[in-house]
């Protein structure tokens, strides 16, 4: 049997690793495939491949996924897998300083320093609204 084949019941365990495989995928509002994906689709698909059902849209993810760990400028040290929410946007932390997201700025899935992204996104949408740990 080929090494890349596994039973349908097997699930991968790392949504961040799945999201990283989608770097350079084109941005497509409403998309959730490797042909085009948006920010909440990236989070939903990455978790679905790992066997975790998440809501489709970022506003529903912001209120219904995991544990709320902070709001606005108030948050603990961010960890791999934490979700960061702005109005109409979500990103997934790859580590404490880097995030993965489907960016309308680059029109693709990118790896970006959290500090740089927060500054750039903040000019349009302000501080993140919430931080959640799935």
PLM regions with names:
Residues 90-91:
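A conserved glycine-rich beta-strand in the N-terminal activation segment of trypsin-fold
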Residues 20:
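Residues forming anionic-ligand binding surfaces in small-molecule and nucleic-acid pockets
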Residues 2-7, 32, 68-72, 94-134:
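Aromatic- and glycine-rich peptidoglycan recognition patches
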Residues 1-17, 25:
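Boundary regions of SH3-family modules and the immediately adjacent low-complexity/disordered segments
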Residues 85-86:
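A generic structural signal for residues embedded in beta-strands
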Residues 27-78:
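Catalytic cysteine-centered active-site loop
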Residues 81-82:
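Structural motif
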């Amino acid at each position: 049997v080929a090494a890349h084949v596994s039973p349908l019941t097997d699930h991968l365990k790392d949504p961040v690793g799945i999201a990283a495989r989608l770097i350079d995928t084109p941005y497509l509002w409403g998309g959730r495939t490797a042909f085009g994906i948006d920010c909440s689709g990236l989070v939903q698909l990455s978790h679905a491949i790992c066997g975790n059902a998440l809501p489709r849209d970022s506003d529903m993810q912001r209120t219904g996924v995991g544990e709320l760990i902070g709001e606005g400028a108030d948050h603990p040290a961010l960890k791999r897998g934490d979700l960061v929410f702005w109005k109409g946007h979500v990103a997934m932390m790859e580590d404490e300083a880097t995030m993965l997201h489907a960016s309308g700025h680059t029109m693709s899935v990118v790896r970006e320093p959290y500090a740089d992204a927060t500054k750039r996104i903040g000019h349009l949408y302000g501080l993140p609204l919430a931080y959640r740990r799935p």
